[in-house]
Amino acid sequence: AWVACETDFVSSNDIFQKFAESVVNHVAHAAPADVDELMGQTFHDGDKTLEVMLKETIAEIGEKSEVAGFARFEAPEGGSVEIYQHFNKQIAAMVAISDAGKADTGYDVAMHVSNLKPEYLTRDEVPADVVDHEKQVQLNRAIEEGKPEHIAEKVVEGRMGKFYEEIVLMEQKFLKDDSKSIKQLLEENGIGVSQMARFAVGENNEDDGEGEDE
């Protein structure tokens, strides 16, 4: 869960961190669909809604705070959810992997996600309109460079590979060893990734601020 505040001082405050942990525990137990539903739910181990608990936390710490987002994964049978959190707690990522025995590889992939910021898990997940737009951009670029249309189309194919490498996890070069892609890394270890999520303070909503990624 991503619980945001305004200053570093509050982000390390025990009261704020306790509330952030409560949000994480509640999301795990109650499986809300979105933040609005989450805030209206009664805390799984109490009698107050998360909205009331947030207001009480704000009153205690004296600083605006909010639950900015969350992701909830259920590990596949025999698998696990691996989490990487940057030391400053402002960037975090999580992935669901198919083999709990390969947790180290899952952690490495989560760290990769936090740094390389893939938008999609596989090439098939990229929306058709996004692909079509990029193809047109690259075709126009190739033609402007003076390439004949039949050559330009081949150039576009090559450039689309680079495009996918930037935004698709499976296509990206592994952060710790760029001689292989994430897809190759997973194949070598005999595991799959079914879900991923990344949170970064100042990137996931309109308001910049400090925060606690739990």
How would you name each of these model-derived features?
Residues A1-E214:
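N-terminal assembly/interaction segments in proteins that build large macromolecular machines
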